[in-house]
Design a protein with these regions (language model features):
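Glycine-rich phosphate/diphosphate-binding loop of Rossmann-like nucleotide-binding domains
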Residues: 196-199, 204-312
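Adenosine-phosphate binding glycine-rich loop
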Residues: 2-28, 223-224, 336-448
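General beta-strand structural signal in soluble alpha/beta enzymes
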Residues: 163-167, 191-195, 238, 261-264, ...
Length: 448
């Protein structure tokens, strides 16, 4: 990667030398540093304070073994992690991911992105991420409980409501958060808001489940409005069929769009009449079945093997909501060729750098994940506030606050991009807007 700023080049080269195998992390850092060139050029004091070197290095990485006993009585050992990236503007905040693919590179990339995303919400939250290479799929409830209890038995000493507040992520839903919270409470003998994404009876927030998908659509609505467009009557393609995708479907439909395609890791479905989010919710959350099952409910829909083909479905708006790097250059080319004019990211870093460059060079409205999918962590922040105040807000109150936060994030990113001569470039605008708050806090707090 070639930067025009020699300071940024040196920082990136040193980082790549120290972490040559961490490609996801280096990709995330590269994208952010590229956006920061004009800001760093305007602030020579950042180099003197070693600000960027400190920004790209986590404050702390905790790695530990997680031994547990399966239903056959056999001892299993997984590896657990918590990356506490930056606490300049608040306690570490970010999800826990339980998936066989979990490694340090992925968690460092997610923790790094989380710093900027949390900053954009304007809530006092630092950035972190954690998880384990444990796969909850195919495990009994008892096995998942024993794993969560073992995981928390080590993690509990490193977290707390004013230190580090984890949440769910891939493989960590309401069930897992409940088991983790129960074990923390048992070990500490105190009832605090140490996790978000909790069940409603024990301190969870209404609208948290819907938040990322809803927030994505609120952000996209603002972006479309600025271009004189709206969801009304538009064909929408959503990759994925998890939490984010299901509620993005619901909100996009409420805003007048028609969601015609959704996917899972096996393939995708196309329903020209619009995919019913309630059916999808039943399939994925109740039956925990593959997306192909949609045909049992709607025989007129079409199923296609292989999830990559979803980008060839003609649409006006595309919302990638599955996983990182799922939208490659070929997918971006197919979207543009078929008339898509807006892409908003619902997953974390779902578009490759080549895909983003292609979309931007073709004048496509593009919303980067750290801005457009910040609804989840924004509502986690609202859950923390409710826990601290010992009260609960209604669904409507939380939804209204979420809507306002997403509108503000859009306008902050758009205004910052314009300020630095990059009008319409929300990637740069979001990176810089998120960075400015963290940089200011870090400069004020000295070399720590």
């Amino acid at each position: 990667m070639a930067f025009t700023n020699p300071y940024l080049q040196r920082v990136y080269d040193d980082l790549a030398k120290r972490n040559p195998e961490q490609k996801e992390f280096l990709q995330a850092v590269e994208e952010v540093l590229e956006s920061l060139e004009p800001v760093v050029a305007a602030h020579p004091e950042y180099e003197k304070a070693g600000l960027i070197e400190r920004l790209v290095e986590p404050e702390r990485i905790i790695m530990f073994r997680v031994p547990w006993v399966d239903d056959a009585g056999k001892v299993q050992v997984n590896r657990g992690y918590r990356v506490q990236f930056n606490s300049a503007i608040g306690p570490y905040k970010g999800g826990l991911r339980f998936h066989p693919s979990v490694n340090l590179s992925i968690l460092k990339f997610l923790g790094f992105e989380q710093c900027f995303k949390n900053s954009l919400t304007s809530l006092p939250m630092g950035g972190g991420k954690g998880g384990a290479d444990f796969d909850p799929h195919g495990k009994s409830d008892a096995e998942v409980m024993r794993f969560c209890q073992s995981f928390m038995t080590e993690l509990y000493r490193h977290i707390g409501p004013d230190t580090d507040v984890p949440a769910g992520d891939i493989g960590v839903g309401g069930r897992e958060v409940g088991y983790l919270f129960g074990q923390y409470k048992r070990l500490k003998n105190e009832y605090t808001g140490v996790l978000t994404g909790k069940g409603i009876p024990f301190g969870g927030s209404l609208a948290r489940t819907e938040a990322t998908g809803y927030g994505l659509c609120y952000f996209t609505k603002e972006m479309l409005a600025d271009a004189g467009k709206s969801f009304e009557g538009q064909r929408v393609v959503i990759s994925g069929s998890g939490n984010v995708a299901i509620y993005a479907n619901q909100k996009a439909t409420q805003l007048g769009g028609k969601v015609i395609a959704m996917s899972d890791s096996n393939g995708y479905i196309v329903d020209e009449n619009g995919i019913d989010y309630k059916v999808m919710k039943e399939i994925k959350e109740v039956k925990r079945a593959r997306i192909k099952t949609y045909l049992d409910y709607v025989p007129t829909a079409k199923y296609v093997e292989g999830s990559q083909g979803i980008w060839t479905v003609p649409c006006d708006i595309a919302l990638p909501c599955a996983t990182q790097n799922e939208l490659p250059l070929a997918g971006a080319e197919a979207l543009v060729a078929n008339g898509c004019y807006a892409v908003a990211e619902g997953a974390n870093m779902p578009s490759t750098p080549e895909a983003i460059a292609y979309l931007q060079s073709h004048g496509i409205l593009f919303a980067p994940a750290k801005a457009s999918n910040a609804g989840g962590v924004a509502t986690s922040g609202l859950e923390m506030s409710q826990n601290s105040l010992r009260l609960s807000w209604t669904f409507e109150e939380v939804d209204e606050r979420l809507h306002n936060i997403m509108v503000n994030i859009y306008h902050s990113a758009a205004a910052t991009a314009e300020k630095y001569g990059m009008k319409g470039n929300l990637v740069a605008g979001a990176n810089i807007a998120g960075f400015e708050k963290i940089a200011s806090a870090m400069m004020s707090q000295g070399i720590v």
